[in-house]
Amino acid sequence: MFTSELQIGIASALTAGTLWGIGPLLLKRALKYTNVSAATLIEQHVSVLLLVVLALYTGEIADIDFSGRAFWSFFLAGGVGASFGKVFFYKGIDKVGASKATSVKNSSPFLTALLAVIFLGEEPSGFLAAGVILIVLGVAVLSPGKENGERAVARLRYFLYPLIAAFCFGVNPIFKKIGIDAVNSPVLGTLITQVTALLFMFLFARPIGLEIKWQRVAAPALGLCTLSGITEGLGSLFTFYALSYGPAAILSPIWRISPLVTFALAHFTLRGIEEVTLRDGAAASLIVIGVFVLSRA
């Protein structure tokens, strides 16, 4: 079916993007019945349990080396993206909606490109400038326009949540690629990132506004968060599979199709919960196109 390793990588990245586009829809529905803290922790525990089973089944659990370069790269990927990035992303879903938060979060290659120019001395190009402009336009279209006063200020403040998530997810693929190049164990890499994320959520719960407490969770919320945890865990796994077959610069932007998946399904799955407009779709398209243009830089 696939004629090259890069094609396998592209297919894996597309699968990850599709799964990550479905997850926010499940989570948004779950937030009808529970709060962000409970939803985040349930989802993260499900992801970890799923990956423990997969790591035992594949035997990759035996490859773990706590002193190796791969372990610490996976650890940083989990600490930055899968924990802080995820919490702020879910806060964004709760405050501004699944489609908007997903679009803003997936502007992360924009921040990656800027950091590369500033700190790594990479040369800016026309593709870089065009991609940045498209992404900025997409985020601007999503931002509140006609609202006035305190409501507009509050909406803008809430947009900081997915923007912070975008920053966290922007550096994430770099750590993933370093780790997967050192040890080609995608399941193990995903497991370490997700376990690290869970650990960081407990350690830094207060600063990031996560409430750690026992609470009753309604059955619909538990089911939806469980499904969301499965899509999150498998989506993350497929990004590692993708990076094991090709460069991050090409494959990372491909799994950023998730805003389009979220937008395409939100109209049918979030009816009565979240208003999704053509403006949201246009913004998602601008951001995704911008990400692909950036990849050409």
Walk through the language-model features, giving the residues of each:
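Alpha-helical transmembrane segments of compact multi-pass small-molecule transporters, enriched
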Residues: 46-51, 104-118, 133, 196-200, ...
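Juxtamembrane helix-start motifs in multi-pass secondary transporters
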Residues: 39-40, 101, 188-189
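Membrane-interface interhelical linkers
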Residues: 1-38, 42-74, 86-96, 137, ...
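Hydrophobic transmembrane alpha-helices of multi-pass small-molecule transport proteins
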Residues: 51, 114-120, 126-146, 277-296
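Hydrophobic/small/kink-forming positions within alpha-helical transmembrane segments
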Residues: 21, 52, 79-83, 109-114, ...
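Alpha-helical transmembrane segments
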Residues: 77-78, 124-136, 185-196
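Hydrophobic core positions of alpha-helical segments in small-molecule transporters
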Residues: 15, 42-43, 104-107, 126-130, ...
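Membrane-helix interface/capping residues of multi-pass secondary transporters
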Residues: 36-37, 98, 124, 185-186, ...
